Amino acid sequence: MQNLEGSGDGQQVEMWTDGACKGNPGPGGWGVLMRAGQHEKTMHGGERQTTNNRMELMAVIEGLRALKRPCRVTIHTDSQYVMKGMTEWLANWKRRGWRTADKKPVKNVELWQALDEQVGRHQVQWRWVRGHAGDPGNERADALANQGMEAARGR
């Protein structure tokens, strides 16, 4: 999928991301579906001991990491945690030295920092989609996340 790597002209990429976890914490997986024009790429991965929120973050991080050049990216996520983190909370966390409003360390800070770095490479728009509501891209990302989780469980 060479064309999904971006052509340097700010290619438009649509990205659907999802995370899944059994037990929370427990085995988890992440999935990404990317489309640029007629080209499509899917990715998934997982960890043996993780949380749903960590897998939601990993999906977006890995999806953006796969783009080798700056692109215009629309990210479709069903995660309020990722959506609010990037659109509402991030600026304040950074201003407070990665602390929450009640001065506690931000959970999953290394993933938020990695995501912030990846987002900085691209022009990103965020779109929230209701999970398990028939959005075809979200359904595929969910299936990929479950594949990642099953692989992490050793099945």
Curated annotation (Swiss-Prot):
Sorted UniProt keywords: Cytoplasm, Endonuclease, Hydrolase, Magnesium, Metal-binding, Nuclease
UniProt xrefs under InterPro entries: RNase_H, RNaseH-like_sf, RNaseH_domain, RNaseH_sf, RNaseHI
Protein residues bound to Mg(2+) 2: D18, D142
BP GO annotations: DNA replication, removal of RNA primer
Binding site residues for Mg(2+) 1: D18, E56, D78
This protein's record includes keyword Cytoplasm: yes
Main location: cytoplasm
Cofactor annotation comment: Binds 1 Mg(2+) ion per subunit. May bind a second metal ion at a regulatory site, or after substrate binding.
Class of the enzyme per the UniProt entry, highest EC level: hydrolase
Entry GO terms, CC: cytoplasm
Single GO term (MF): magnesium ion binding
Catalytic activity reported: Endonucleolytic cleavage to 5'-phosphomonoester
CDD domains assigned: RNase_HI_prokaryote_like
Domain RNase H type-1 span(s) in chain numbering: 9-150
Localization in the cell: Cytoplasm
EC number: 3.1.26.4
UniProt cofactor(s): Mg(2+)
Protein origin, superkingdom: Bacteria
Family: Belongs to the RNase H family.
Record function comment: Endonuclease that specifically degrades the RNA of RNA-DNA hybrids.
Record's subunit section: Monomer.
HAMAP family reported for this sequence: RNase_H (MF_00042)
Protein name: Ribonuclease H
Species assigned in the record: Bordetella pertussis (strain Tohama I / ATCC BAA-589 / NCTC 13251)
Gene: rnhA
